[in-house]
């Protein structure tokens, strides 16, 4: 039996489309990728250039935008190259590298959304303690903890995958190297891998989600108790944007990874993964800029400043 050292590359099936539609597919995903990069970069620039947004909430939002760019780049760039060159292969090392970055950025998305929910909980439910609880040192510690934990999880999955044997060069039924499709190609015992996918995957998915739900269980009644219209409007503005992103993110994530195999076909899995890795990061900047008054103001000031400089 050959081991993993004899495997040089995998074949990525990609998104099913007739050959004559491949260029159209390339154009669509290239446009979506550029919109994602532009939108999230504008969010980062707006937050960095506006002193009014130098708060914990927008600190995590800027990091979330950076992670969204990384999540999309880790999967879409290789797919675009494969479509354009019509060479749908990825090296063994490239596959493991892509898997690592996809897992790290995907898990960071979940953790940052939970951190933002906790920030809103402290700001709305315990406003007098906010400056103490969410001081810069605490935010930096939370950020570092998120990066460390997600790197550990991603490295664990990657190292466990690297120990497996692959008898033949196989076809990955996906457009990137996700864990489950690659595991199906192994001729080794994948019991440990599957157990770690269940344990670690469930932890990094469910625990942040429960933190978000718990935070909003306390936030919603607190908002309803606010008597001034201005106070309700400001609280609702920041929370509604975050809730929209949470719903889109976890909705696509659950569709991609928690649907029973007997119900979801491979095509539906690929479509759900595309929503999670491509569409969601593209929509996030629009959600925050359309529903958040502070962000809309910061973007207007950013563009007005640049127009003055250019003139």
Swiss-Prot record:
Extracellular side: 1-23, 78-98, 157-194, 258-270
Membrane topology: Multi-pass membrane protein
Cysteine pairings via disulfide bonds: 95-187
Source organism superkingdom: Eukaryota
Gene Ontology molecular function terms on file: G protein-coupled receptor activity; olfactory receptor activity
Residue runs in coiled coils: none
Database matches in CDD domains: 7tmA_OR1_7-like
Subcellular location(s) per record: Cell membrane
Name of the molecule in the record: Olfactory receptor 1N1
Species per Swiss-Prot/TrEMBL record: Homo sapiens
């Amino acid at each position: 039996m050959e081991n993993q050292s004899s495997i040089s590359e995998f074949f990525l099936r990609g998104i099913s489309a007739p050959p004559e539609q491949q260029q159209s597919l390339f154009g669509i995903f290239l446009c979506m990728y550029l919109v994602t990069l532009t939108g999230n970069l504008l969010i980062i620039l707006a937050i960095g250039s506006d002193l009014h947004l130098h708060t914990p909430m927008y600190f995590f939002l800027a990091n979330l935008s950076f992670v969204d760019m990384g999540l999309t780049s880790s999967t879409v760039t290789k797919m675009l190259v494969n479509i354009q060159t019509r060479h749908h292969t990825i090296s063994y090392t490239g596959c493991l590298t892509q898997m690592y970055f996809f897992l790290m950025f995907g898990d960071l998305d979940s953790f940052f959304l939970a951190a933002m929910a906790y920030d809103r909980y402290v700001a709305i439910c315990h406003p007098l303690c906010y400056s103490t609880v969410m001081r810069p040192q605490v935010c930096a510690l939370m950020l570092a903890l998120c990066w460390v934990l997600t790197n550990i999880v991603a490295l664990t999955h990657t190292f466990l995958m690297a120990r497996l044997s692959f008898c033949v060069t196989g076809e990955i039924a996906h457009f990137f190297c996700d864990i489950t499709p690659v595991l199906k190609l192994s001729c080794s015992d994948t019991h440990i891998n599957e157990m770690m996918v269940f344990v670690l995957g469930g932890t990094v998915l469910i625990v942040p989600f429960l933190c978000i739900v718990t935070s909003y269980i306390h936030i919603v009644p607190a908002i309803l108790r606010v008597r001034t219209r201005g106070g309700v409007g400001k609280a609702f503005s920041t929370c509604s944007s975050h809730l929209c992103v949470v719903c889109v993110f976890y909705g696509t994530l659950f569709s991609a990874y928690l649907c029973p195999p007997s119900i979801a076909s491979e095509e539906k899995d690929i479509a759900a993964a595309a929503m999670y890795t491509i569409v969601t990061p593209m929509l996030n900047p629009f959600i925050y800029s359309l529903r958040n008054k502070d962000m809309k103001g910061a973007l207007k000031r950013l563009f007005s400043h640049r127009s003055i400089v250019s003139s």
